[in-house]
Swiss-Prot record:
Catalytic residues, chain numbering: E142
Alphabetical GO biological process terms: co-translational protein modification; translation
Alphabetical keyword list: Hydrolase, Iron, Metal-binding, Protein biosynthesis
Keyword Ligase appears in the UniProt entry: no
Cofactor field: Fe(2+)
GO MF entries: metal ion binding; peptide deformylase activity
Domain of life assignment: Bacteria
Lineage, highest ranks first: Bacteria, Pseudomonadati, Bacteroidota, Cytophagia, Cytophagales
Role: Removes the formyl group from the N-terminal Met of newly synthesized proteins. Requires at least a dipeptide for an efficient rate of reaction. N-terminal L-methionine is a prerequisite for activity but the enzyme has broad specificity at other positions.
Residues reported to bind Fe cation: C99, H141, H145
The protein's name: Peptide deformylase
Annotated EC: 3.5.1.88
Organism: Amoebophilus asiaticus (strain 5a2)
Record text on cofactor binding: Binds 1 Fe(2+) ion.
Xref: Pfam families: Pep_deformylase (PF01327)
Length: 188
């Protein structure tokens, strides 16, 4: 199943997602999230972006892996009830990020180059990973969604003001995208 993406302005994107009860059957939802993410040509997708306020996100960073081989089990990841740890000291890197919920708006976001994340995988096995570079960036972006933070929140006030009309157009559903979006009217 392909879910419609929840756009900027919907209140669910500003909420803290609820932890998921250990052992909950998520397999169908997880597969649908990967299908939805791929249909929208995304690198990651958080459950709030499909209208589910739960602590779950999926990522696929295979386009950024330089080994020449796509290894689905290695690059397609599921993160349930994640806890992100930032290494100190850490190097901050900048990169222009997009977001499926805010189409057409790209923001230079400072992120930690290296992070550690503790989570449950799709089989409810506790995991811990150290991530660097693009995988670390994608995980930080999706993790932010679980706490109501969007990539535009990293903008200076003057830059955000310049984007006000574009953001309002997205909020009102006046945006063209090649994937399904859901405009429910539950605005912030």
């Amino acid at each position: 199943m392909i879910y419609p993406i929840v756009p900027y302005g919907e209140s669910i994107l500003r909420q803290t997602a609820a932890p998921i009860e250990l052992g909950t059957d998520l397999e169908t939802l997880i597969e649908s999230m990967f299908i939805t993410m791929n249909a929208a040509k995304g690198l990651g997708l958080a459950a709030p972006q499909i209208g589910k306020s739960i602590q779950l996100f999926v990522v696929d960073v295979s386009p950024f892996v330089g080994d020449g081989m796509v290894q689905p089990d290695k690059h397609r990841k599921v993160y349930i009830n994640p806890v992100l740890e930032i290494y100190q000291p850490n190097t901050i890197t900048h990169y222009e990020e997009g977001c499926l919920s805010i189409p057409g708006i790209y923001v230079d976001v400072p992120r930690n180059k290296r992070v550690r994340i503790k989570f449950f995988d799709r089989n409810w096995q506790a995991q811990e990973e150290d991530l660097v570079d693009m995988p670390a960036r994608v995980v930080q972006h999706e993790y932010d969604h679980l706490y109501g933070k969007l990539h535009i929140d990293y903008l200076r006030a003057d830059r955000r003001l310049r984007l006000k009309s574009k953001l309002e157009n997205i909020k009102q559903g006046r945006v063209e995208v090649a994937y399904k979006m859901s405009f429910t009217g539950n605005k912030v």
